[in-house]
From Swiss-Prot:
GO terms for biological process: translation. GO terms for molecular function: structural constituent of ribosome. Belongs to the bacterial ribosomal protein bL33 family. It comes from Cicer arietinum. This is Large ribosomal subunit protein bL33c. Its main location: plastid.
Amino acid sequence: MAKGKDIRITVILECTSCDKKSVNKESRGISRYITQKNRHNTPSRLELRKFCPFCCKHTIHAEIKK
């Protein structure tokens, strides 16, 4: 059995293009998704292509700090 830290952790994915637009106040919000990742298989930051309802297109969503 696993000792100490859990192998699967919950991560938050945030739209990278909305993040850039929010500085200019053009966007209505920032799209975020919650998912899980396996620490052993993906030790680096997770990036997935997901649909952003604020951009109305598929964009790259990157893992953010909690």
